[in-house]
Regions:
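Long, charge-rich alpha-helical interaction segments
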Residues: 1-2
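Core of folded catalytic or high-affinity ligand/protein-binding domains
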Residues: 9-81, 88
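Basic, alpha-helical nucleic-acid-binding regions used in initiation and control of genome expression
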Residues: 68-70, 74-123
Length: 123
């Protein structure tokens, strides 16, 4: 529900550059959370799965600044059962709805690579 509300706000009220800037900022936060120490400090993890780790990091972003800082500072463990894959496609969906075009035609590549282990400084 939270994602749908944000999607509506994003595509109804914002221009293309704002959507692209949001995507870049989201990618930066996901990139910063891409750390071996965060994964190793997590709970409810069976074995490393790149897609799950990405979706878990996305969940962190949906829960606000304090939660993000608690995770990145290792105050709280990342919970392997909590995921939010919908966030990852939010900018492309907003652009698609706003422009009445296919999501595959989304023209923006985010500033940071969000895939697991792309932040080589911390792996």
């Amino acid at each position: 529900m939270k994602i749908q509300i944000f999607l509506n706000l994003l595509y109804q009220n914002l221009n293309h550059q704002y959507i692209f800037d949001f995507h870049d900022l989201m990618s930066e936060f996901l990139y910063e959370l891409d750390r071996k120490e965060i994964y190793e400090h997590s709970i409810n993890q069976e074995q490393f799965n790149e897609e799950d780790f990405l979706n878990q990091r996305a969940y962190v972003l949906t829960n606000g600044n304090k939660y993000y800082h608690d995770i990145i500072s290792l105050i709280k463990p990342l919970d392997g059962e909590l995921k939010c894959p919908q966030l990852l496609t939010l900018p492309a969906k907003a652009w698609s709805i706003k422009n009445n075009k296919s999501i595959e035609k989304y023209p923006h590549t985010p500033k940071y690579n969000i895939q697991a282990k792309s932040n080589t400084k911390y792996w």
